[in-house]
Amino acid sequence: MPPPEATRLSPHRALGLPLVFTLGLVAFGFLDAVRQNPRLLWSILGAAAALVVWNAVLTLSALRTGRTLKLEIVLRKQHYLQACAQASVLLYWGWYWREVYDSAHLIAAQLVFAYAFDMLLGWSRRDTYTLGFGPFPVIFSINLFLWFKPDWFYLQFLMVALGFAVKELIRWDKDGRRAHIFNPSSFPLAVFSLGLILTGKSDLTWGQDIASTQFYLPHMYVTLFLIGLPGQFFFGVTSMTMSAVVTTYVFGLLYFAATGVYFFYDSYIPIAVFLGMHLLFTDPSTSPRTELGRVIFGMLYGLSTVVLYVLLGRAGLPTFYDKLLQVPLLNLSITLIDRLARSSALRALDPAALGPSLVPRRRNLAYMSIWTILFAVMSAVQGVGDSHPGQWLPFWRQACKDERPYACPYLEDVLSSFCGRGSRWACNEGGMLDRVGAVESSAPPTLDDYPIILRGSKGPIVERTPAVLYAVACREGWPDTCGHAPD
């Protein structure tokens, strides 16, 4: 396909385009949801003011030097397919956690800000700007993992700006061409995550709510699996996702065999981590080129998530950062990983040696077939899915009785949470566990307790008839509930 022909524009016409997006950002300030929060309003107006000043300075400079600016329109499949996948997750997630829908205008505000910022940055450094869907996957990706609460939303604009600045300014030679080093969404996520950790200000964000509410959705694992398939077919990233998932799952199995409890407590792979394995670190532009390198890349992401979970937990820090902090370091390591993958020591392990005559699309299909089989097996044995036993109290009560590592402290935390939601039984159980240090025999939960204590890590139980509650309790392993005839 021939390269797109750029349209030549005068500075006034060219720089009118980012100004239109800036005015679109100002328009969000007229929404009632924004006007009712002065700090949010000033965040939006402040971001717009900075863009207006930059636009004016760039226009005057271009007029003074007689520059002719150019505009290319390139619609890259990588961008719009990824954006469609991310948008699907956002739409499905918002149905079960309304904060996503309530924040739709803020996601849109970030998007128009991103277009204006990217245009101004591009034309500040060169004469040609390429317009396409590029900002969509960056903004959607950031908002799948971290966003600031309205009172601190100016930090969200700074996070977006950092992502586009890093993509433009920090580059290296890759396969004979200049390319960005860092993924423009994962880099600002990592930097701001580190800043929030160091300042102890994680409560300025929805980070913990994001990580937990993404599991409220029914069949979320299979949803992410299906959403990831088009990108895996077209861009050959299956080996990264598959190796990351399998590595983390195998570690979880070994940990359970050694301790009798689950490493991530309520899952083998938390849903937010599973999301990161599909839609965060798999950017083909910032990942290894070799097939073995991509397998190693995925394994390192999975193992680094495990290590970060331990380090953050032992430091008393929020563990939802475990999927975010490592990605820039992995991006920096891709040339080393490719060099290692091409070495004689690992040549025998290179999957590219299998079926060397396969064209890329058929090779992608082969990887996807293997991944589909593995995912089906993991789902069948509750390696992923909605029914992991680590969600349910009966497992942790028995684990605490058996004095398995970390079981009693975790059980106490869960009971405290359920007590805070209104379960008197959980309050009583938690009090006894705190006093005695072990699970004691007590009265069974009542029907008033069941809607609270049966939800596990999922969203609220909607249907609360006695028959349904006893059926759920039986499925979770509560004693004397199977075959119970409610009064």
Predicted regions located by residue number:
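Internal/C-terminal transmembrane anchor helices
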Residues: L358-V384
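N-terminal signal-anchor module of multipass membrane proteins
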Residues: P2-W123, V381
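Membrane-interface helix-loop-helix junctions at boundaries between adjacent transmembrane segments
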Residues: S124-T213
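C-terminal ends of transmembrane helices
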Residues: W54-L71, A114-D127, L162-R178, F225-F235, ...
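Loop-to-transmembrane alpha-helix initiation sites
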Residues: Q36-G46, F215-H219, T241, F263-I271, ...
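Short helix-capping/linker turns of helical repeat alpha-solenoids
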Residues: E403-P405, S416, G422-R424, G430, ...
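Cytoplasmic-side transmembrane-helix entry/capping segments in multi-pass membrane proteins
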Residues: E72-L81, T128-V138, L155-L158, R178-L189, ...
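Internal active-site segments that recognize and position negatively charged phosphoryl groups
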Residues: P188, L196-Y249, L253, A257
